[in-house]
């Protein structure tokens, strides 16, 4: 009855007043109303470290966290984790903001949007003494302790298990008396604060993707909570911040699976609710090795530099470990929000298939607004075309024929100058052409080209079509050698007359005459 009361208060008050009063209904309802939003609203976070360009794996984490929140109408929080001062890179915070804005992953809260859970930068939170306060609470509870061991002592604790060197701290500082600890603290001895892990039994944690995972407690080291420089460790700061910010779902790479039981122990020591864990599969290259900087496309910025468009990158990254029920592949960001179900994330490593990304990028380029495409393509066209061409027409030719923008120069460089080419290119089985027939056709068509005044595509094509009809030839029998002569390429972004319109009459005649000489 009480469960029903909390769902439908008016009905409950009317139908069962005794149950209402006996169970303290009004107090329960007041608490429920006050906590309704925080109890029901999904809150995810992206907490990058400002250490340089954004790795594809981090972008996927941000995207999945965003999609999980937005699919359920929840909040997506940006938090900057800059507690590792040694790895901090100047300007990296700007890269984070630029990447988030560029990909459309707009945060609801963050350093620039404080909604009452700030500060959202860990170094600022650390400066307030926040993490130390919670670490000291654990010390008072007996769940943490000061450790004064130096590098030499820690080195002596290492041992080899199954051919692998491991280090399990032996808790020697846990046995220090309170007086001894205080004396050493007063003397200013360097120290850390460690969590007091149980040494017997097991710890089980649940992950949405990987299910229940159980580890022996004896395998879990007394992890450091506060480092000797006073900064919290990544693990500890995460737990504190996620709890205080009301994070309901934690999305991260599966390399953190081994840390999850330690996280749970900290949550339990504080008596806090454990969030939903969503660990994403590893991203590998085509050789099934971890995607690294050496691959040349491990970061979002790398991909932009290589001519990939943001929408294609986001679409592709979404499919690195997740697939929709209908096997569809092209999604806008709003469509991803609608379709994304994190329960369908795979356990298996996701392969970064650059060929598939190129294909997908080509699909987005085809759909791009022609004016937007022209603006993006112009710098690539001007790399190889130095004369005054109709660049808009050339852009129209290549838009449906490229996969990335850097494909453009090699596709159009012949407009500037015919490359050296093998005369065997005139041989085409389907067009029934060879070097001899091509030479004859070019000699026959040259007077037609010389007499033609209007070199725009339609009139030019009409004149050549009339020539073809008059001679009783097939279209390709004439157009193949003509296109080869004016381009010197097997593959071109347009037909012979379209190319001739771009280069003009004078250049066309020059190239056809050169081809006749080459074939003679």
PLM region descriptions:
Residues 370-471:
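Small-residue-rich helix-loop
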Residues 17-27, 482:
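Short, often N-terminal, low-complexity regions
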Residues 458-519:
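Charged substrate- and nucleic-acid-binding regions of tRNA-handling and nucleotidyl-transfer enzymes
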Residues 120, 226-227, 245-257, 284-316, ...:
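Conserved phosphate-binding loops in nucleotide/dinucleotide-binding enzymes
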Residues 55, 65, 96, 138, ...:
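Residue-level signal for inorganic ion chemistry
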Residues 140, 145-279, 285-291, 324:
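Active-site cores that bind ATP or allylic diphosphates and position pyrophosphate for catalysis
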Residues 1-15:
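Single conserved hydrophobic/aromatic residue that forms the stacking wall/gate
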Residues 39-162, 260-272:
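N-terminal Rossmann-like or analogous alpha/beta NTP/dinucleotide-binding catalytic cores
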């Amino acid at each position: 009855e009480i469960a029903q009361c909390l769902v439908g208060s008016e009905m409950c008050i009317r139908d069962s007043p005794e149950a209402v009063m006996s169970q303290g209904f009004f107090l329960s309802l007041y608490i429920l109303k006050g906590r309704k939003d925080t109890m029901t609203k999904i809150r995810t976070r992206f907490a990058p470290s400002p250490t340089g360009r954004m790795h594809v794996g981090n972008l996927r984490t941000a995207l999945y966290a965003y999609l999980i929140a937005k699919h359920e109408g929840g909040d997506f929080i940006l938090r900057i984790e800059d507690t590792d001062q040694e790895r901090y890179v100047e300007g990296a915070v700007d890269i984070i903001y630029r990447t988030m804005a560029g990909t459309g992953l707009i945060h609801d809260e963050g350093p620039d949007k404080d909604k009452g859970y700030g500060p959202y930068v860990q170094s600022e939170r650390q400066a307030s003494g926040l993490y130390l306060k919670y670490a000291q609470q654990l010390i008072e509870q007996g769940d943490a302790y000061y450790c004064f061991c130096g590098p030499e002592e820690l080195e002596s604790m290492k041992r080899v298990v199954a051919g692998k060197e491991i280090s399990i701290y032996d808790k020697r500082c846990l046995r220090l008396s309170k007086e001894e600890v205080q004396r050493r603290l007063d003397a200013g001895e360097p120290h850390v604060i460690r969590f007091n892990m149980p040494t017997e039994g097991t710890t089980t944690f649940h992950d949405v993707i990987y299910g229940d995972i159980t580890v022996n407690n004896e395998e879990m080291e007394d992890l450091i909570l506060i480092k000797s420089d006073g900064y919290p460790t990544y693990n500890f700061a995460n737990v504190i911040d996620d709890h205080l910010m009301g994070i309901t779902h934690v999305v991260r790479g599966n390399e953190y699976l081994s840390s999850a039981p330690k996280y749970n122990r900290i949550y339990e020591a504080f008596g806090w609710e454990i969030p939903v864990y969503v660990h994403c599969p590893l991203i590998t290259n085509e050789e099934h090795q971890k995607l690294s900087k050496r691959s040349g496309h491990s970061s979002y910025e790398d991909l932009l530099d290589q001519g990939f468009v943001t929408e294609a990158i986001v679409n592709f990254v979404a499919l690195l470990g997740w697939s929709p029920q209908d096997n569809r592949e092209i999604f806008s960001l709003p469509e991803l929000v609608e379709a994304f179900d994190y329960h369908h994330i795979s356990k298996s490593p996701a392969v970064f298939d650059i060929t598939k990304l190129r294909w997908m990028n080509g699909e987005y380029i085809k759909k791009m607004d022609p004016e937007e495409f022209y603006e993006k393509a112009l710098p690539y066209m001007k790399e190889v075309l130095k004369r005054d061409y109709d660049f808009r027409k050339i852009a129209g030719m290549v838009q449906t024929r490229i996969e990335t923008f850097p494909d453009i120069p090699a596709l159009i460089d012949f407009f500037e100058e015919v490359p050296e080419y093998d005369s065997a290119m005139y041989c085409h089985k389907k067009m029934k052409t060879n070097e001899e027939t091509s030479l004859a056709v070019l000699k026959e068509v040259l007077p037609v080209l010389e007499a033609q005044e209007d070199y725009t595509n339609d009139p030019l094509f009409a004149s050549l079509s009339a020539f073809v009809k008059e001679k009783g030839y097939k279209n390709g029998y004439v157009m193949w050698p003509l296109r080869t002569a004016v381009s010197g390429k097997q593959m071109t972004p347009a037909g012979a007359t379209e190319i001739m319109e771009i280069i003009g009459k004078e250049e066309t005649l020059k190239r056809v005459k050169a081809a006749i000489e080459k074939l003679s």
